[in-house]
From Swiss-Prot:
Disruption of the gene: reported phenotype: Completely abolishes the production of novofumigatonin and asnovolin A.
Coiled-coil spans in chain: none
Family annotation (InterPro entries): PaxB-like
Species of origin: Aspergillus novofumigatus (strain IBT 16806)
Name of the protein in its database record: Asnovolin H synthase nvfL
Length: 243
């Protein structure tokens, strides 16, 4: 079943249609807040807030579905293009401040622009291959869920490997989490309140994506809280020493 039918088909009532459209707008707002906050904290902390592989993957997905396989829905096109531009800013921060994060790996430190070029090109090829395999409109949805899991996994891995919250914040995490929750609820509503609901929203694979996403992002929030609390304790101890 083509997921775009579920995303754009009329629903059983105007009230349900209003709720679904509101959730879609809230998703866009939440992700915009997350990306803008990520860019802000990247420059403030002189680092980057998105791990390299998820960043390459997101930029590639947004490029493919903004400029190659453009969705017919104007709102979605604008949304994807905005996210693409914001992620370019985050990538610039990663290149600019790479020396702060990759002192232990000079090969990466010196070649980050090349790594981004190869990584984004490879991811674009992968998204185009999936679109050619199953069709761009279906690939749009499934690859987006894949991007979400890669992003959540990368964010958690980066937080744990750094042992620091630099480049991140509760705003970045919570707006990212809520953005995905809003779109999942919207899709569920469109599935339930459409007379001939498609099979994909209730598929085992989609349910697996949702379950793993919640596990990863709540784990991230839990770890972020404990690491940030320890940072505040250390900062307070340093201030006491200076007195």
């Amino acid at each position: 079943m083509d997921p775009w039918i579920a995303l754009s088909s009329p629903l059983t009532s105007q009230t349900v249609e209003y709720v679904a459209n509101t959730l879609r707008i809230m998703c866009a707002i939440s992700w915009n807040i997350s990306y803008m906050s990520m860019a802000y904290y990247s420059f403030r902390d002189k680092t980057y807030g998105n791990a390299l592989i998820p960043l390459c993957n997101n930029i590639a997905w947004e490029f493919v579905y903004s400029f190659i396989h453009c969705p017919k829905l104007t709102f979605v096109r604008i949304e994807n293009t905005g996210w693409f531009l914001l992620n370019i800013v985050v990538m610039y921060a990663a290149i600019k401040y790479s020396e702060n994060e990759w002192k232990h790996a000079p090969l990466v430190q010196r070649n980050l622009p090349f790594i981004f070029a190869v990584g984004i090109s490879a991811m674009i090829a992968g998204h185009l291959a999936l679109a050619a395999q199953i069709g761009p409109r279906i690939a749009f949805v499934w690859s987006a869920k894949g991007c979400q899991l890669v992003l959540s996994t990368g964010a958690l891995s980066q937080l744990l490997s750094r042992g620091s919250t630099r480049g991140g914040s509760y705003v970045v995490w919570l707006s990212r989490y809520l953005g995905t929750v809003f779109i999942d609820v919207m899709v569920t509503i469109r599935h339930v309140y459409r007379a001939a609901g498609p099979s994909w929203p209730s598929s085992p694979l989609l349910l697996w994506f949702m379950a793993v996403f919640h596990l990863l992002d709540w784990t991230y929030g839990f770890c972020f809280y404990h690491i940030r609390r320890q940072e505040l304790v250390s900062e307070a101890a340093e201030k006491d020493k200076d007195k």
